[in-house]
Structure formats: structure tokens, C-alpha cells
Amino acid sequence: MGIVARQSIKGTIATYIGVAVGIVTTFFIQTKALQPEQIGLIDILLQCALLFGGLAQLGTNSSAMRYYPFFKDEDNRDHGFFGWTLLVPLVGFSFFLLAFFLFKGAIVEFFTKDSEVGAELFAKYVNFVVPLAFFSLYISVFETNSNLLLRIVLPKFVREVGLRVGTLAIYLLYFYKVLNFDGVIVGFCVLYGLATLVNIVYLFSLQRVSFKIEWKFITPQLKRDFLFYTLFMITAALAGNVIPMLSKFFVAAKTSFRLAGVFTIATNIAAVIEMPYRSLGAISRPHISEAMAKKDVQRADELCKSVTLHQFIAGSFVLFLVWINIDYLFDLLPKGDIYRLGKWAVLLLSLSRLVYSTFAVTTTVLSYSKYYYYSLIFTVLLAGMSIALNAWWVPRWDINGGALANLVSYFVYFILLLVFIKWKIGVMPLSRKLLPVAMIVLVLFAFNWLWTSALTPLIVKPFEKPIVGLTLDAALKSSLFFVLGLTSLYKLKVSQSVNDLIDRVWDVFRDK
């Protein structure tokens, strides 16, 4: 994949450094320092900010990816294209600010009417959604600008590492009573503000970016096309941005903020599944956009198949490692008995994240094709289905209902989307190479069942402290099955890129 692979690898390294920090923060510091209802509150505030910030973009991120090839001109600093990416979201945020204060009462009532534990906290801190939304908005916009210039590493580092390190610091200050809970909420606002500032400075350092808009470059036809596209993307974003958050909102509103905290931990565990796609997808989108702009369907099809295959390999292996160690993870967590309530939600959410990250490239293809307006139909369908299923299942099955609603909604959505883009565009991300990957993972699950039944009791028994034996057991089986899985991939030659990577790693160890 050339530059796609190189930038993706660097971005993935930054992502997994962030994952390491995030694991310590989320599963050990946060659960130790905060009560479940406080965890639920912070997550709901951040999710509301991400939702409103996403809507305030007015489709800027998608529009930027689609129209940048028309502006791309290094000699003329891209005709001030990046100025548009600042102006449009600012207009959107102004509308959001007005809507927020008009409907704040209804928002507070939704989260407090039926919720039990922790609802009063939301009413107290709801105004902090505004600064968090503003900073989240421009963190995303500046990261998209960097992606367009194929410079994803620093913005990725800021998002995946910087924000997590800052979050860790905030929780430690709260744990040691340097901050009270008010200080925690204010601290998040300061943290996101600093992240936005770093991204601004980085963009200026590239010296390619100009925020001075060249109004004369915008032809009437381009203006009409842009406004028409943006109109659809705004409506699509209204549905698309809501989906990942709906289950969290319903769990908090229809059960309690305490269970929302449990659901947050389950969601954070499952989020590891899609980490590779965050880099792979970010660096692939400009190339897919360029291929679609040139009507190079074959190139777009090759990119989609490659992204889908490599994300499925990475995601399914990570899902396997997470699930075979899930009980051990809950044994390690502070207040683990409380968060163990989310065990099956972890599995359902992990499967949902695997489905989403594997096939999310289909939404990219549709957005950059001449059929982009169909994205509105698909996302409204997804939103409607998700709302209905959450409203039906959360009151019945609590967090498991929310997780199941998430999985079923995405599964149906992507089946329909796969059929559509094959029919209308001629792109099919699915390939036969996915089958051997699925078979390898299923066989590994069978081996794990045998291991757990026969060997785990023997490994744990000699130790006075069971946690020591469980740690050894987790390390042994994870290492063995991971190596076995990679060996199987290598022998079956599922991916030449994976084989080349294994060869390079093997050569390093062999030379030593």
C-alpha cells in the first residue's frame, strides 16, 4: 500500500501507545478514583460534546475529503481551501449554540426523568458541553486537514496519546484530592483546549496551509455542488453521529448513570477492536477520494479490499485476545465485581466494533461517489433502527440490550450498504481472503475452550494467590495462540503485506 501502509503503521504505533496509557487510565486509575455514576456522567458529557461538535461541522470533514482534489495546488497554497474548513464549522457552531440553549431543558429532562443514580450530576454540569463541543469540533477539523496533507502522525499522537495522558493526570489529581469533581470537569475543558492549540500550531508549521480564502476560485457550479453536498452531509451527520452514542444515552436515561458507567467501561474495552482502522481509514480516505474523483473504480476497489482485509485481520485477532482474557481483566479491575455486569455487553460491543471497522470503508466510497446523497437514506435508516431497538431492548435487558441494539443495527446497515455500492458503483470490499481469517480465529476459540477446560486449573492450582496463576495462564495462552494465529496467516498467504511484515520482524530477531 506504499505511503498508506507507512503512515498507517506510524499512526497505529501512536494509537497503541495511547491504548497503553488508556488501559492504565480507564481500567485502573479511573475505576479506582471515581464511582461508576461519575464515570457515566463524564462519558455522557463527552459524548454529548462529540455529538454536537460533529453536527456543528456541517459536513466539513466529508466535504473536505471530497473537494480537496479540486483545490489541490501546492504553488497557490491550495487556493485557501483550509480557510473554508475553519469558517463553515464556525457557522455551524453558532447554530449549535443557539439550539443548545433553546433545548437545554428538554435535554436535561431526557437524562433525568427515568434515570436513578447520578442524574442530578448531569443537570449540574450540562453547560460544560459547550466548550467541550467547540474544542472537539476543531480537534477533528484540524486532524482532517492534516490527513489531507498525508501527515497524520502528530494529530493522531495528540488525540490518542496527548488527550489520554492529560486524562490520566486529571484523574490522579482528583484521586490525591488536589482537584475536586468540579475541577475534573474544568480540567477536561482545559485539556481539549490545549489539544486544539497544538493542532493549530502544527498546521501552520507545515507552511503549505493558507487560511486566506480565494473567493474568485469558487465557481458558481462548484459552489452549488458544494452546498448541495453539504446539505445532505449535514442531515446524514445528524443520523451518523448519533448512532455510536445512542446506546450510551439510552442506558443513562432509562436505567441509571451507575449502569452507564459500567457500559462505558465495557465500551472502552470493545473500542480496542477498531484501533487499527483509525489509522488505516484516516490515511486511506484521501486516496479513495482521489480514485473516485478520477472515476478509477478499479483502484478504489483494490484499496477497499485491502483496508477491509487488514482491518478484519487486526480486529478479529484483538477481539479474540480480549475475550479469552475477559474474566482475568475483571479480576484485575478495581471494583471489578461491579464492572463484571458488563461482560456480555463487551462481547456484543466488540462484535459491533469489528463489523463497523471492517466495513466502514463502504461509507467512504459512497460519500465520495456521485451517489453520495443515498448516504442520507442509509444513515436515517440506521438511526431509526437504532433508536427503535434501544428504546425496546434497553428497558428490558439494560446494558446488554443497548449492546445488542448496536450490533444488530450496524449488521443490517452494512449488509444493505455492501449490496448498494456493488450494484451502483462496482466496488466490493469483501473478498475470499476474509474466509481463512475467520476460520483461523474460530479454530483459536476452540483451542482456547480446550485450554481453559484442561490446562487453566492445572496452571492456577500451585499458586497460593490465584491472581498469580491467572496472570501466568493469560500470558501463556495469549502468546501461544497469537503466534499460532500469525503462523497460520503466514502459511496460508492471506496477505502479502502481513507476510512481508512478519519476514522483516523475523529477520531482525534472526540477525541478533
Regions found by a protein language model. Give the residues of each.
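Helix-loop junctions and terminal segments of transmembrane helices
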Residues: 57-73, 148, 266-308, 363-368
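Interfacial segments at transmembrane-helix termini and the short loops linking adjacent helices
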Residues: 106-129, 323-353, 460-468
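Hydrophobic alpha-helical transmembrane segments
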Residues: 157-173, 177-207, 380-387, 399-420, ...
